[in-house]
Amino acid sequence: MKSIRMLMVMLALDDLLKNPYETFRIADELRRELVGDTVTYVVNRNINFTDICINDCKFCSFRNRKKYLLSLDEIKQKVEEAVEFGCTELCIQGGLLPDADLDFYLSILQAVRDVDKKIHIHAFSPMEVVHAARNSGMTVEEVLKELKKEGLGSMPGTAAEILDDSIRALICPRKLKTAEWVEVIKTAHRVGIPTTATIMYGHIDTWEHRINHLLLIKKIQQETGGITELIPLPFMSKNNELGRYAKGSSGFDDLLMIAIARILLYPEIKNIQASWVKMGQKLAQAALHVGANDLGGTLMEENISKSAGATSGEFMHPEELRELIKIAGRVPKQRDTLYNILD
């Protein structure tokens, strides 16, 4: 029965892929039904605390480029700047330092809390959590509980790439397997830590891989309800090994990815982000008419996409984001990390 249902889904999606403009229309209708004409953004700061990493992901242009590691004082300074700017969120991630254990990640949270007790900390990918657990001789659940106790508010659902182990074996062979990623996400939800979800597409993946990935995300959400948004991430092909074989998605493909995600994830996941950093401002505006309802954050700095060739900048003032949304014919609203409206 399960295989029959999957066949029906694939046949329906094949029709959607063959009729993209109808797909765009359907996705936009579903977006309007779920969230209306509101388009959200978050005032946040990105902090990539190190580019040193023991992994060897073929799509990564960030790893070991400068071999830097921010001190806790440097992190505190960035937090102070974020608070002064009015940020409600800090997004904190980094490479995998060889000996990074739970205490290392706790020290980052403590540094943030030394500066500000209230700002929301959105930090540490599932890969970082598994890495901390391995280096500490602890379970993932134990690590997550300690991180939450120290102030972790939510987790980015990064390190997902494509949730298919045959693809992962080629593009990120040392990264956690699909089942491990799913288990970390479910465990986070179980202990009260919401997460985002991501998909990195446009390399050696096919639409079948993408669809299976989205259906897995949908299944997780049906079980836990802990996913706040989906963030589709087009592969950036500059300065990395994978870019020698794959040049990335087209703009049309990016829009179709947004639309298919909206349709497939309906109604479980309400929020789909169009990343202005990766897509560019104009394509992100277009995405607001094919299913997306969020433009992400101000960031203040962003190192990972920039190192892979992104040219859209790494900071956008809230007023610029609002104007971008208005020009696209939507209603801008500032949100927090968990999609509570702050306007």
UniProtKB/Swiss-Prot annotation:
Binding-site residues, [4Fe-4S] cluster: C53, C57, C60
UniProt KW Iron keyword: yes
Gene Ontology MF terms in the entry: 4 iron, 4 sulfur cluster binding; 5-amino-6-(D-ribitylamino)uracil--L-tyrosine 4-hydroxyphenyl transferase activity; 7,8-didemethyl-8-hydroxy-5-deazariboflavin synthase activity; iron ion binding
Catalytic activity field: 5-amino-6-(D-ribitylamino)uracil + L-tyrosine + S-adenosyl-L-methionine = 5-amino-5-(4-hydroxybenzyl)-6-(D-ribitylimino)-5,6-dihydrouracil + 2-iminoacetate + 5'-deoxyadenosine + L-methionine + H(+)
SMART domains from the UniProt entry: Elp3
Source domain of life: Archaea
Cofactor: [4Fe-4S] cluster
Keywords linked to the UniProt accession: 4Fe-4S, Iron, Iron-sulfur, Metal-binding, S-adenosyl-L-methionine, Transferase
InterPro entries: Aldolase_TIM (IPR013785), CofH/MnqC-like_C (IPR045567), CofH_family (IPR019940), Elp3/MiaA/NifB-like_rSAM (IPR006638), F420 (IPR034405), FO_synthase_su2 (IPR020050), rSAM (IPR007197)
Pathway listed: Cofactor biosynthesis; coenzyme F0 biosynthesis
Domain Radical SAM core: 39-268
Functional summary from the UniProt entry: Catalyzes the radical-mediated synthesis of 5-amino-5-(4-hydroxybenzyl)-6-(D-ribitylimino)-5,6-dihydrouracil from 5-amino-6-(D-ribitylamino)uracil and L-tyrosine.
Subunit structure: Consists of two subunits, CofG and CofH.
Name by which UniProt lists this protein: 5-amino-6-(D-ribitylamino)uracil--L-tyrosine 4-hydroxyphenyl transferase
